[in-house]
């Protein structure tokens, strides 16, 4: 979920059929201009509440067993166009990758962000130990273009806090770099979004963490918390 500069609430979600994470499927969208009282599709069509699998707007169809995570990152451009960042396996022969799904004109487009080389599965119940994090996605105007930034963590990059930047979605080239020098384990990114919205400054909350698969118990000692302040972007 995110709230744009005009106060519109943008909401995206996936459906799950059972407690098994692998049954996650499909990416849906709704928006509200009155604080959540009434909801609309991106087309302007008003939802008849409650929103169900039958009447929801499907912005991208993703089948079960696609390693689709059940939490998405969201932001909106200056004109209120929503952007959704998440990851899934786009085709049975492909590896799980990060993608940006974004509204452009009257439709939705998809841009592949990563080129990962390592496979994994989300099959099974409980909290999973996953080699990549859920993403945080941000956007800003830079040099007259709507720039998109995605913060994430990936074991292929030694579990550092990393960022992928696309300077022009009409020519979606993503440049990936690391924001720190030390791995942060199973860290999931979080940032001060109000500071980003008001001043364009990125402050990240960092802490070395450990997630044991299937609700296991970690033996890691308590770790210090620190803030990575406004890295060069």
Model-derived segments and their meaning:
Residues 1-233:
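Extracellular, repeat-based ectodomains that mediate carbohydrate processing or recognition
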């Amino acid at each position: 979920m995110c709230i744009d500069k005009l106060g519109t609430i943008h909401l995206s979600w996936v459906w799950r059929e059972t407690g098994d994470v692998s049954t996650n499927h499909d990416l849906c969208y709704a928006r509200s201009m009155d604080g959540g009282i009434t909801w609309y599709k991106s087309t302007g069509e008003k939802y008849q509440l409650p929103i169900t699998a039958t009447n929801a707007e499907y912005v991208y169809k993703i089948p079960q067993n696609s390693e689709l995570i059940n939490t998405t990152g969201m932001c909106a451009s200056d004109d209120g166009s929503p952007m959704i960042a998440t990851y899934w396996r786009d085709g049975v022969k492909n590896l799980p990758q990060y993608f940006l799904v974004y509204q452009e004109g009257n439709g939705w487009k998809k841009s592949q962000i990563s080129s990962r080389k390592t496979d994994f599965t989300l099959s099974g119940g409980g909290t999973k130990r996953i080699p990549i994090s859920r993403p945080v996605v941000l956007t800003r105007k830079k040099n007259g273009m709507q720039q998109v930034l995605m913060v994430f963590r990936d074991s292929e990059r030694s579990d550092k806090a990393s960022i992928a930047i696309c300077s022009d979605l009409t020519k979606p080239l993503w440049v990936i770099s690391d924001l720190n020098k030390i791995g942060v384990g199973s860290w999931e990114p979080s940032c001060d979004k109000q500071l980003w919205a008001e001043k364009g400054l990125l402050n990240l909350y960092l802490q070395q963490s450990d997630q044991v698969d299937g609700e296991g118990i970690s033996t890691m000692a308590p770790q210090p918390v620190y803030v990575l302040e406004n890295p060069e972007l």
